[in-house]
Protein backbone atom coordinates (compact mmCIF):
# COMPACT_ATOMS: atom_id res chain seq x y z
CA UNK A 1 0.00 0.00 0.00
CA UNK A 2 1.33 3.44 -0.90
CA UNK A 3 2.08 6.05 1.77
CA UNK A 4 2.15 9.82 1.41
CA UNK A 5 4.55 12.33 2.89
CA UNK A 6 5.09 16.05 2.27
CA UNK A 7 8.65 16.84 1.22
CA UNK A 8 10.40 20.05 2.34
CA UNK A 9 10.46 21.41 -1.21
CA UNK A 10 6.76 21.13 -1.86
CA UNK A 11 3.39 20.93 -0.17
CA UNK A 12 2.39 18.27 -2.70
CA UNK A 13 2.35 14.76 -1.19
CA UNK A 14 4.77 12.28 -2.72
CA UNK A 15 3.54 8.73 -3.14
CA UNK A 16 5.96 6.23 -1.68
CA UNK A 17 6.34 3.02 -3.63
CA UNK A 18 9.11 0.63 -4.57
CA UNK A 19 10.65 3.21 -6.92
CA UNK A 20 10.50 6.20 -4.55
CA UNK A 21 12.30 6.56 -1.24
CA UNK A 22 12.37 9.57 1.05
CA UNK A 23 15.84 10.74 1.99
CA UNK A 24 15.52 11.29 5.74
CA UNK A 25 18.26 13.92 5.58
CA UNK A 26 15.68 16.12 3.83
CA UNK A 27 13.46 16.22 6.93
CA UNK A 28 13.71 18.34 10.07
CA UNK A 29 12.33 16.90 13.32
CA UNK A 30 8.76 18.09 12.78
CA UNK A 31 8.75 16.57 9.31
CA UNK A 32 10.38 13.38 10.60
CA UNK A 33 7.64 12.97 13.20
CA UNK A 34 4.97 13.47 10.53
CA UNK A 35 6.74 10.89 8.37
CA UNK A 36 6.74 8.33 11.17
CA UNK A 37 3.11 9.12 11.97
CA UNK A 38 2.25 8.32 8.35
CA UNK A 39 4.03 5.00 8.82
CA UNK A 40 1.80 4.24 11.81
CA UNK A 41 4.63 4.80 14.31
CA UNK A 42 4.85 6.95 17.43
CA UNK A 43 6.72 10.27 17.20
CA UNK A 44 9.50 9.18 19.58
CA UNK A 45 10.67 6.75 16.91
CA UNK A 46 11.60 9.75 14.77
CA UNK A 47 13.73 11.08 17.62
CA UNK A 48 15.48 7.71 17.96
CA UNK A 49 16.32 7.55 14.28
CA UNK A 50 17.50 11.18 14.20
CA UNK A 51 19.84 10.46 17.09
CA UNK A 52 21.39 7.60 15.14
CA UNK A 53 21.64 9.72 12.01
CA UNK A 54 23.27 12.77 13.53
CA UNK A 55 24.90 11.74 16.81
CA UNK A 56 26.52 8.65 15.31
CA UNK A 57 26.50 9.55 11.59
CA UNK A 58 24.72 6.28 10.92
CA UNK A 59 23.19 5.71 7.48
CA UNK A 60 22.36 2.01 7.88
CA UNK A 61 19.00 1.13 9.46
CA UNK A 62 20.29 -2.34 10.41
CA UNK A 63 22.82 -0.74 12.77
CA UNK A 64 20.10 1.07 14.74
CA UNK A 65 19.93 -1.57 17.44
CA UNK A 66 17.25 0.04 19.61
CA UNK A 67 14.82 0.10 16.66
CA UNK A 68 12.76 -3.09 16.32
CA UNK A 69 13.34 -5.27 13.26
CA UNK A 70 9.85 -4.73 11.87
CA UNK A 71 10.30 -0.96 11.78
CA UNK A 72 13.81 -1.29 10.38
CA UNK A 73 12.41 -3.40 7.59
CA UNK A 74 9.66 -0.89 6.91
CA UNK A 75 12.17 1.96 6.81
CA UNK A 76 14.36 0.13 4.32
CA UNK A 77 11.38 -0.16 2.00
CA UNK A 78 10.36 3.50 2.00
CA UNK A 79 13.32 5.58 3.17
CA UNK A 80 17.05 6.08 2.92
CA UNK A 81 19.78 8.15 4.56
CA UNK A 82 21.89 9.41 1.67
CA UNK A 83 24.43 12.18 2.13
CA UNK A 84 26.32 13.59 -0.86
CA UNK A 85 29.69 11.96 -1.45
CA UNK A 86 33.14 13.51 -1.22
CA UNK A 87 34.82 13.19 -4.61
CA UNK A 88 38.01 15.10 -3.85
CA UNK A 89 39.89 16.16 -0.73
CA UNK A 90 42.64 18.75 -0.41
CA UNK A 91 44.60 19.47 2.76
CA UNK A 92 46.30 22.76 3.48
CA UNK A 93 49.57 23.17 5.30
CA UNK A 94 47.65 25.03 8.03
CA UNK A 95 45.29 22.08 8.71
CA UNK A 96 42.36 23.36 6.65
CA UNK A 97 40.59 20.68 4.59
CA UNK A 98 38.55 21.36 1.46
CA UNK A 99 36.14 18.74 0.18
CA UNK A 100 34.60 18.75 -3.28
CA UNK A 101 31.17 17.19 -2.80
CA UNK A 102 29.10 15.73 -5.62
CA UNK A 103 25.54 17.05 -5.92
CA UNK A 104 24.07 15.35 -8.94
CA UNK A 105 26.40 15.93 -11.88
CA UNK A 106 28.06 18.96 -10.30
CA UNK A 107 30.20 19.83 -7.29
CA UNK A 108 30.07 22.22 -4.39
CA UNK A 109 32.85 22.85 -1.91
CA UNK A 110 32.88 22.53 1.87
CA UNK A 111 35.75 23.67 4.08
CA UNK A 112 36.82 22.41 7.52
CA UNK A 113 38.84 24.99 9.48
CA UNK A 114 40.41 23.75 12.74
CA UNK A 115 41.64 26.16 15.39
CA UNK A 116 42.99 25.74 18.91
CA UNK A 117 39.61 26.02 20.61
CA UNK A 118 37.12 25.19 17.85
CA UNK A 119 36.58 23.72 14.40
CA UNK A 120 34.43 25.59 11.91
CA UNK A 121 32.72 24.10 8.87
CA UNK A 122 31.99 26.43 5.95
CA UNK A 123 28.91 25.13 4.12
CA UNK A 124 27.51 25.88 0.65
CA UNK A 125 23.83 26.64 0.01
CA UNK A 126 23.67 26.79 -3.79
CA UNK A 127 25.43 25.38 -6.85
CA UNK A 128 27.11 28.61 -7.90
CA UNK A 129 25.71 32.06 -7.18
CA UNK A 130 23.67 34.58 -9.16
CA UNK A 131 24.69 37.75 -7.31
CA UNK A 132 27.94 38.34 -9.23
CA UNK A 133 29.97 40.02 -6.48
CA UNK A 134 33.03 41.09 -8.41
CA UNK A 135 35.68 39.95 -5.91
CA UNK A 136 34.28 36.41 -5.40
CA UNK A 137 35.36 33.34 -7.37
CA UNK A 138 32.04 31.55 -6.82
CA UNK A 139 30.14 34.39 -8.49
CA UNK A 140 32.21 34.02 -11.65
CA UNK A 141 30.98 30.44 -12.10
CA UNK A 142 27.36 31.43 -12.68
CA UNK A 143 24.34 29.85 -11.00
CA UNK A 144 22.75 26.44 -11.50
CA UNK A 145 20.33 25.60 -8.69
CA UNK A 146 19.53 25.64 -5.00
CA UNK A 147 20.78 22.79 -2.84
CA UNK A 148 18.23 20.54 -1.16
CA UNK A 149 18.08 20.19 2.62
CA UNK A 150 19.87 16.83 2.36
CA UNK A 151 22.64 18.41 0.28
CA UNK A 152 23.16 21.18 2.84
CA UNK A 153 22.93 19.20 6.08
CA UNK A 154 24.63 16.37 4.22
CA UNK A 155 27.80 18.46 4.02
CA UNK A 156 27.82 18.68 7.82
CA UNK A 157 26.96 14.98 8.13
CA UNK A 158 29.73 13.93 5.75
CA UNK A 159 32.32 16.17 7.40
CA UNK A 160 31.33 14.98 10.89
CA UNK A 161 31.67 11.38 9.76
CA UNK A 162 35.12 11.98 8.28
CA UNK A 163 36.38 13.96 11.28
CA UNK A 164 34.81 11.52 13.74
CA UNK A 165 36.57 8.61 12.06
CA UNK A 166 39.86 10.49 12.27
CA UNK A 167 39.85 11.41 15.96
CA UNK A 168 43.08 9.48 16.42
CA UNK A 169 44.79 12.14 14.31
CA UNK A 170 43.72 14.82 16.75
CA UNK A 171 41.19 16.48 14.45
CA UNK A 172 38.77 18.56 16.47
CA UNK A 173 35.04 17.80 16.13
CA UNK A 174 32.91 20.45 14.42
CA UNK A 175 31.85 23.15 16.89
CA UNK A 176 30.68 25.90 14.52
CA UNK A 177 28.93 26.03 11.16
CA UNK A 178 28.99 29.07 8.90
CA UNK A 179 26.72 29.42 5.87
CA UNK A 180 29.47 31.20 3.97
CA UNK A 181 30.28 28.73 1.20
CA UNK A 182 29.00 28.81 -2.36
CA UNK A 183 25.73 30.68 -2.90
CA UNK A 184 23.50 33.28 -1.23
CA UNK A 185 21.67 31.49 1.62
CA UNK A 186 18.73 33.91 1.65
CA UNK A 187 17.90 32.95 -1.94
CA UNK A 188 17.36 29.38 -0.71
CA UNK A 189 15.40 29.86 2.53
CA UNK A 190 13.13 26.87 1.83
CA UNK A 191 16.07 24.51 2.24
CA UNK A 192 18.56 26.51 4.31
CA UNK A 193 16.22 27.04 7.27
CA UNK A 194 15.29 23.34 7.78
CA UNK A 195 18.98 22.45 7.45
CA UNK A 196 19.89 24.97 10.15
CA UNK A 197 17.04 23.65 12.31
CA UNK A 198 18.71 20.23 12.17
CA UNK A 199 22.06 21.79 13.09
CA UNK A 200 20.44 23.32 16.21
CA UNK A 201 18.20 20.38 17.16
CA UNK A 202 19.26 18.33 20.19
CA UNK A 203 18.45 15.22 18.16
CA UNK A 204 20.41 16.68 15.23
CA UNK A 205 23.89 18.13 15.67
CA UNK A 206 22.90 20.06 18.81
CA UNK A 207 24.86 23.22 18.07
CA UNK A 208 24.21 26.44 19.97
CA UNK A 209 22.40 29.09 17.93
CA UNK A 210 25.39 31.33 18.54
CA UNK A 211 27.57 28.78 16.74
CA UNK A 212 25.53 28.66 13.53
CA UNK A 213 26.09 31.76 11.40
CA UNK A 214 24.35 32.82 8.21
CA UNK A 215 26.08 35.33 5.96
CA UNK A 216 24.16 37.39 3.42
CA UNK A 217 24.93 40.01 0.80
CA UNK A 218 21.65 41.78 1.44
CA UNK A 219 18.46 40.17 0.13
CA UNK A 220 16.38 42.43 2.36
CA UNK A 221 12.85 40.92 2.17
CA UNK A 222 14.29 37.45 2.77
CA UNK A 223 16.29 38.75 5.76
CA UNK A 224 13.07 40.14 7.24
CA UNK A 225 11.45 36.75 6.72
CA UNK A 226 14.43 34.90 8.25
CA UNK A 227 13.90 36.65 11.58
CA UNK A 228 10.44 35.10 11.83
CA UNK A 229 11.69 31.62 10.94
CA UNK A 230 14.83 30.94 12.98
CA UNK A 231 17.32 32.59 15.32
CA UNK A 232 20.96 32.18 14.33
CA UNK A 233 24.00 34.42 14.33
CA UNK A 234 24.10 36.88 11.44
CA UNK A 235 27.03 38.15 9.39
CA UNK A 236 26.62 40.61 6.55
CA UNK A 237 28.82 40.97 3.48
CA UNK A 238 29.10 44.76 3.44
CA UNK A 239 32.50 45.34 1.83
CA UNK A 240 32.03 49.06 1.16
CA UNK A 241 31.51 52.27 3.14
CA UNK A 242 29.18 53.89 0.60
CA UNK A 243 26.72 53.02 -2.15
CA UNK A 244 29.00 54.17 -4.97
CA UNK A 245 31.62 51.53 -4.21
CA UNK A 246 29.12 48.85 -3.17
CA UNK A 247 27.06 49.29 -6.36
CA UNK A 248 30.20 48.37 -8.28
CA UNK A 249 31.46 45.38 -6.29
CA UNK A 250 28.18 44.00 -4.83
CA UNK A 251 25.55 44.52 -7.57
CA UNK A 252 22.54 43.63 -5.40
CA UNK A 253 23.18 46.97 -3.68
CA UNK A 254 21.55 48.67 -6.68
CA UNK A 255 18.24 47.19 -5.52
CA UNK A 256 18.75 47.18 -1.74
CA UNK A 257 21.16 49.94 -0.84
CA UNK A 258 23.22 50.12 2.32
CA UNK A 259 20.68 52.12 4.31
CA UNK A 260 17.92 49.65 3.43
CA UNK A 261 20.18 46.68 4.20
CA UNK A 262 21.30 47.99 7.59
CA UNK A 263 17.69 48.76 8.49
CA UNK A 264 16.82 45.11 7.92
CA UNK A 265 19.85 44.06 9.96
CA UNK A 266 18.70 46.16 12.92
CA UNK A 267 15.20 44.67 12.65
CA UNK A 268 16.73 41.19 12.74
CA UNK A 269 18.82 42.04 15.80
CA UNK A 270 15.67 43.17 17.63
CA UNK A 271 14.24 39.66 17.21
CA UNK A 272 17.44 37.70 17.80
CA UNK A 273 19.07 36.32 20.92
CA UNK A 274 21.80 34.45 19.03
CA UNK A 275 23.66 37.62 18.08
CA UNK A 276 23.93 39.01 21.61
CA UNK A 277 22.75 42.33 20.23
CA UNK A 278 25.28 42.80 17.46
CA UNK A 279 26.00 41.67 13.91
CA UNK A 280 29.30 40.70 12.31
CA UNK A 281 30.32 43.03 9.49
CA UNK A 282 32.40 41.34 6.78
CA UNK A 283 34.62 43.72 4.85
CA UNK A 284 36.96 42.42 2.16
CA UNK A 285 40.06 44.56 1.74
CA UNK A 286 40.65 45.48 -1.92
CA UNK A 287 43.80 47.42 -2.67
CA UNK A 288 43.03 51.10 -3.38
CA UNK A 289 39.34 50.31 -3.90
CA UNK A 290 37.81 50.37 -0.41
CA UNK A 291 40.81 50.29 1.94
CA UNK A 292 41.84 53.93 2.43
CA UNK A 293 41.69 55.70 5.78
CA UNK A 294 38.95 57.92 4.33
CA UNK A 295 36.94 54.75 3.70
CA UNK A 296 37.51 53.67 7.31
CA UNK A 297 36.14 56.98 8.60
CA UNK A 298 33.13 56.65 6.29
CA UNK A 299 32.52 53.08 7.50
CA UNK A 300 32.68 54.13 11.14
CA UNK A 301 30.15 56.89 10.52
CA UNK A 302 27.93 54.49 8.56
CA UNK A 303 27.84 51.89 11.33
CA UNK A 304 27.45 54.17 14.35
CA UNK A 305 23.80 53.12 14.84
CA UNK A 306 24.34 49.41 14.12
CA UNK A 307 25.74 47.35 17.03
CA UNK A 308 28.47 45.28 15.42
CA UNK A 309 31.94 43.87 15.34
CA UNK A 310 33.96 44.23 12.15
CA UNK A 311 35.93 41.49 10.40
CA UNK A 312 38.46 42.81 7.91
CA UNK A 313 39.17 40.13 5.32
CA UNK A 314 42.37 40.24 3.24
CA UNK A 315 41.18 39.56 -0.30
CA UNK A 316 42.08 36.14 -1.68
CA UNK A 317 43.00 36.21 -5.38
CA UNK A 318 41.66 34.00 -8.15
CA UNK A 319 42.53 33.88 -11.87
CA UNK A 320 41.26 36.80 -13.94
CA UNK A 321 40.20 38.96 -11.00
CA UNK A 322 40.75 42.71 -11.48
CA UNK A 323 41.75 43.39 -7.86
CA UNK A 324 44.77 43.20 -5.63
CA UNK A 325 45.05 42.35 -1.94
CA UNK A 326 45.51 45.30 0.38
CA UNK A 327 48.94 45.53 1.94
CA UNK A 328 49.34 44.73 5.61
CA UNK A 329 50.16 48.37 6.30
CA UNK A 330 46.93 49.61 4.66
CA UNK A 331 44.90 47.02 6.56
CA UNK A 332 46.60 48.04 9.81
CA UNK A 333 45.87 51.73 9.27
CA UNK A 334 42.25 50.95 8.36
CA UNK A 335 41.84 48.82 11.48
CA UNK A 336 43.30 51.50 13.76
CA UNK A 337 40.84 54.09 12.47
CA UNK A 338 37.89 51.80 13.25
CA UNK A 339 39.22 50.98 16.71
CA UNK A 340 39.64 54.69 17.43
CA UNK A 341 35.84 54.94 17.08
CA UNK A 342 35.40 52.11 19.58
CA UNK A 343 34.58 49.29 17.14
CA UNK A 344 35.74 45.77 17.90
CA UNK A 345 37.83 45.10 14.81
CA UNK A 346 39.43 41.80 13.82
CA UNK A 347 41.66 41.07 10.84
CA UNK A 348 40.63 37.62 9.70
CA UNK A 349 43.50 35.19 9.40
CA UNK A 350 43.65 33.71 5.90
CA UNK A 351 43.22 29.94 6.04
CA UNK A 352 43.52 27.40 3.25
CA UNK A 353 44.58 29.81 0.51
CA UNK A 354 47.17 27.30 -0.74
CA UNK A 355 44.29 24.97 -1.72
CA UNK A 356 41.89 27.74 -2.86
CA UNK A 357 39.77 27.18 0.24
CA UNK A 358 39.98 30.71 1.62
CA UNK A 359 37.15 33.24 1.72
CA UNK A 360 35.95 34.08 -1.80
CA UNK A 361 37.93 31.30 -3.50
CA UNK A 362 35.35 28.49 -3.58
CA UNK A 363 34.37 27.56 -7.11
CA UNK A 364 33.20 23.95 -7.33
CA UNK A 365 32.04 22.64 -10.70
CA UNK A 366 29.00 24.56 -11.94
CA UNK A 367 27.01 24.26 -15.15
CA UNK A 368 25.68 27.80 -15.48
CA UNK A 369 21.98 27.56 -16.29
CA UNK A 370 21.01 31.07 -15.31
CA UNK A 371 20.64 33.42 -18.23
CA UNK A 372 21.95 36.91 -17.62
CA UNK A 373 18.43 38.37 -17.59
CA UNK A 374 17.47 35.98 -14.80
CA UNK A 375 20.64 36.82 -12.90
CA UNK A 376 19.72 40.49 -13.09
CA UNK A 377 16.25 39.61 -11.83
CA UNK A 378 17.75 37.74 -8.88
CA UNK A 379 20.00 40.71 -8.12
CA UNK A 380 17.27 43.28 -8.60
CA UNK A 381 14.29 41.71 -6.90
CA UNK A 382 13.46 38.91 -4.52
CA UNK A 383 12.26 35.71 -6.09
CA UNK A 384 9.05 34.36 -4.56
CA UNK A 385 10.40 32.97 -1.30
CA UNK A 386 7.99 30.04 -1.47
CA UNK A 387 9.61 29.04 -4.74
CA UNK A 388 13.24 29.10 -3.62
UniProtKB/Swiss-Prot annotation:
Which family does the entry's similarity section mention?
A: Belongs to the radical SAM superfamily. RlmN family.
Paired cysteines (S-S): 122-359
Q: Which cofactor does it need?
A: [4Fe-4S] cluster
Q: Which parts of the sequence belong to the Radical SAM core domain?
A: 115-354
Q: Which Pfam families match?
A: Radical_SAM, RlmN_N
Q: Give the CC-aspect GO terms.
A: cytoplasm
Annotated residues for binding of S-adenosyl-L-methionine: 183-184, 215, 237-239, 316
What is the protein's known function? Specifically methylates position 2 of adenine 2503 in 23S rRNA and position 2 of adenine 37 in tRNAs. m2A2503 modification seems to play a crucial role in the proofreading step occurring at the peptidyl transferase center and thus would serve to optimize ribosomal fidelity.
Q: What is its EC number?
A: 2.1.1.192
- Say which enzyme class the record assigns: transferase
Localization (cell): Cytoplasm
PROSITE patterns the UniProt entry points to = RADICAL_SAM
Question: Entry's CDD domains?
Answer: Radical_SAM
The note filed under miscellaneous reads: Reaction proceeds by a ping-pong mechanism involving intermediate methylation of a conserved cysteine residue.
Provide the active-site residues from the annotation: 109 (proton acceptor), 359 (s-methylcysteine intermediate)
What gene name is listed for this protein? rlmN
**From what organism does this protein derive?**
Salmonella paratyphi B (strain ATCC BAA-1250 / SPB7)
The residues that the entry says bind [4Fe-4S] cluster are 129, 133, 136
Q: What is this protein called?
A: Dual-specificity RNA methyltransferase RlmN
Amino acid sequence: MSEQIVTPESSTPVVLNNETKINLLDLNRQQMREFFKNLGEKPFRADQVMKWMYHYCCDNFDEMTDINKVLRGKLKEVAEIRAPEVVEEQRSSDGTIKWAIAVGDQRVETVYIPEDDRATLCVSSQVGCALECKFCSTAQQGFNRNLRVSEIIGQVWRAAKIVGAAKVTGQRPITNVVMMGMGEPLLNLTNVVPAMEIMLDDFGFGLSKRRVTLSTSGVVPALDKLGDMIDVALAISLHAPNDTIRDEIVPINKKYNIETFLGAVRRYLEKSNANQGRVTIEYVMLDHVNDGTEHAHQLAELLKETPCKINLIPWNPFPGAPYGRSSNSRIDRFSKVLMSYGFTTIVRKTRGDDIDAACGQLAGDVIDRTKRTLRKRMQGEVIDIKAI
